[in-house]
Amino acid sequence: MFQDNPLLAQLKQQLHSQTPRAEGVVKATEKGFGFLEVDAQKSYFIPPPQMKKVMHGDRIVAVIHTEKERESAEPEELIEPFLTRFVGKIQGKNDRLSIVPDHPLLKDAIPCRAARGVEHEFKEGDWAVAEMRRHPLKGDRSFYAELTQFITFADDHFVPWWVTLARHNLEKEAPNGAATEMLDEGLVRQDLTELDFVTIDSASTEDMDDALYAQELGEGKLQLTVAIADPTAWIAEGSKLDNIAKIRAFTNYLPGFNIPMLPRELSDDLCSLRAQEVRPALACRMTIAADGTIEDDITFFAATIKSKAKLAYDNVSDWLENTGSWQPESDAIAQQIRLLQRICLSRGEWRHNHALVFKDRPDYRFILGEKGEVLDIVAEPRRIANRIVEESMIAANICAARVLRDKLGFGIYNVHMGFDPANADALAALLKTHGLHVDTGDVLTLEGFCKLRRELDAQPSGFLDSRIRRFQSFAEISTEPGPHFGLGLEAYATWTSPIRKYGDMINHRLLKAVIKGETIARPQEETTQQMAERRRLNRMAERDVGDWLYARFLNDKAGTETRFAAEIVDISRGGMRVRLVDNGAMAFIPAPFLHAVRDELVCSQESGTVQIKGETVYKVTNVIDVTIAEVRMETRSIIARPVA
């Protein structure tokens, strides 16, 4: 009699519409219960039985119940699942398999089985890629996943690399394919094989992109010719190899090895500017005035060169600093190094006065054994030879940015707009509390940004600099010329690494059109979006592999008295994140390790400080001594403790 009763249906509808609901993201805890986080201020408790229906990170709608003035959330509808495609470790065997996602807050095993067409017989400990197929909030009884790819066995020494690449869906090897002969591009190549070009790289580098040649012009002027490897002489636009490079967008540099954008035959041989080998190149010649200014007579041209020496950063730096036993092989090479050093110093001075110069941070290099074990991690400071190459490349990229802007009106540009206009007032207010007064309109201009950066660089510590970083916008890849506030430049377009960056290959094709006086189409927005997405994924992959290797390296230091100097990089309610100065590892110091009485402790992200009993004890950028309290291998996290 109650079936299809319109009154009953109406009553149900009313009850449904009157029941309070909230949409938010599920946050799991290690204790079985969870929270529905609606926004920064509001969250609802989810009891353990209800947590069985959801997973950490799910975006859901929940019914809000109130009992004895206590609110709790009952998950009702799934808006967006946290897990779709994921990597994890297999448990069980034969017909009863489950997979534990490789995520710090997902501990529960999910029942699974191999998808059709996946031949591998999965066993306990195997690593796999899986895709979620069932979810309790979608009317299914339980969670269920399908194994779509075998990654590797539990005892593979290279698990960190293979699992990370699979997680981010990135290629694990060099592309196949060969370029048999150079294209006829209708370019006249200048023969520069007699000139004393040199390459300066790490000793182990095989994919040499750039060669340099300098000469004196008189009146304090110097001429710099930058010759860049020419892969577009071999790879036609729209060809199979070009499409592979477009998808990869960059060579992926991971600790221990790289996965190139181009086949190794090209990247490490045919295109690489090897010593004593004749190679096609795209070249830029510029005049550098006595004060470091790049004059207007910039010329781009196609060339053939023969590098006369493969030089290594450390050797060149040692020689210029009068240390070590290395000597240039000839007076001509010695003369080149001296001239390039002069260009470096003069351009560095010009950028210091008219643009912006980054503070030197060391690069950290993992030294690995045959089985992927970390033998050591060394900090490699940026020395004079690194700066010679850096200044030459920046100068060449400024030249390309100008020529592409003036001749075509487009290109692949690196654009950075400085501060987000929405943050200008908050920025000015923060600076004012530290005695710096800025005009909110002025600081959004390139000139105003550079002025502020120079004032910050003159501060006794980097504390204020670190506070305002959160107000900055992100660098973008754009086809439209625009300023790069971070470098303090009106425009910046890279073309000096075409073996490892697809955007640089595009700029080569555009520059060749300029050289030939031809028209050419503007690059498509989808291409820049793909490059931005790949850059993001490659950076995450590098960080993930690094975290794994740092955990392996520091595992035997856990619980010991070994001290490490550590710079505080971030402070949150839960504690402090620090970077170990000697090796670059990130570690976390939980708030209870800072002070035992929670009520007397204030960890403020807003002010970047930790206060104990009202006194500021720690601030971001402080360097403190720590020991390693614990290394959690399953989450690759390092827990540190300040030395009392």
UniProtKB/Swiss-Prot annotation:
SUPFAM superfamilies: Nucleic acid-binding proteins. It catalyses: Exonucleolytic cleavage in the 3'- to 5'-direction to yield nucleoside 5'-phosphates. Gene3D superfamilies: 2.40.50.640, Nucleic acid-binding proteins. Residues 189-516 form the RNB domain. Keywords: Cytoplasm, Exonuclease, Hydrolase, Nuclease, RNA-binding. Its main location: cytoplasm. GO terms for biological process: mRNA catabolic process. Its EC number is 3.1.13.1. The keyword Nucleotide-binding does not apply. Residues 561-643 form the S1 motif domain. InterPro entries: CSD (IPR011129), NA-bd_OB-fold (IPR012340), RNase_B_OB_dom (IPR013223), RNase_II (IPR011804), RNase_II/R (IPR001900), RNase_II/R_CS (IPR022966), RNase_II/RNase_R (IPR004476), RNR_Ribonuclease (IPR050180). It is found in: Cytoplasm. GO terms for molecular function: exoribonuclease II activity; RNA binding. It is an enzyme of class 3 (hydrolase). PROSITE patterns: RIBONUCLEASE_II. Pfam families: OB_RNB, RNB, S1. GO terms for cellular component: cytosol. The keyword Cytoplasm applies. Belongs to the RNR ribonuclease family. RNase II subfamily. Involved in mRNA degradation. Hydrolyzes single-stranded polyribonucleotides processively in the 3' to 5' direction. This is Exoribonuclease 2. The gene is rnb.
